[in-house]
Design a protein with these regions (language model features):
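Conserved C-terminal alpha-helical bundle
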Residues: 1-41, 59, 63-65, 100-104
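GST superfamily/GST-like fold recognition
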Residues: 2-6, 43-71, 76-81
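Short leucine-rich amphipathic alpha-helices used at interfaces
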Residues: 14, 21, 66-67, 109-111, ...
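Residue-level signal for nonpolar/aromatic packing positions in well-ordered secondary structure
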Residues: 34, 52, 82-88
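Surface-exposed helix-capping loop/turn segments at secondary-structure junctions
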Residues: 36-47, 87-91
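Residue-level signal for well-ordered alpha-helical positions
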Residues: 65, 94-95
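Acidic/histidine-enriched, glycine/proline-rich intrinsically disordered or flexible terminal extensions
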Residues: 95-119
């Protein structure tokens, strides 16, 4: 669901309000579930696991999903805990050198990402 949110909010060649609203609200619903789970757990599976690593990668671009961690205090605590772990921190530094958030893809990137010609 969060990938669809990214697509319709950031990448879609035409802005479709229904799709933007639908997936933004779905992202909000998922963040609420995550916040509830983390209200009495330090990590998603009680101990740090691949579930945390995988979910972290989807929470990181939250602005593209129309979400603010201030609205989800348990997710914010969890996110802040995960991002300073040595391997995560090292990975983020590699990404910061190679990735631009919200950059509009050119024709070649569009083809690679969506396997379709840009309109």
């Amino acid at each position: 669901m969060l990938g669809q949110t990214h697509h319709f909010r950031t990448y879609a060649p035409e802005k479709i309000e229904y799709a933007i609203n639908r997936y933004t609200k779905e992202a909000e619903r998922l963040y609420k579930i995550l916040d509830n789970r983390l209200s009495d757990h330090d990590f998603l599976a009680d101990e740090y696991s691949i579930a945390d690593i995988a979910t972290f990668t989807w929470v990181r671009p939250r602005k593209m999903q129309g979400q603010n961690l201030d609205d989800y205090p348990n997710v914010k605590r969890w996110y802040d805990t995960i991002k300073v772990r040595p391997a995560i921190s090292e990975g983020l530094s590699v990404l910061s050198d190679n990735m631009k958030w919200n950059a509009k893809p050119g024709s070649k990137e569009w083809e690679n990402m969506f396997s379709a010609s840009k309109k």
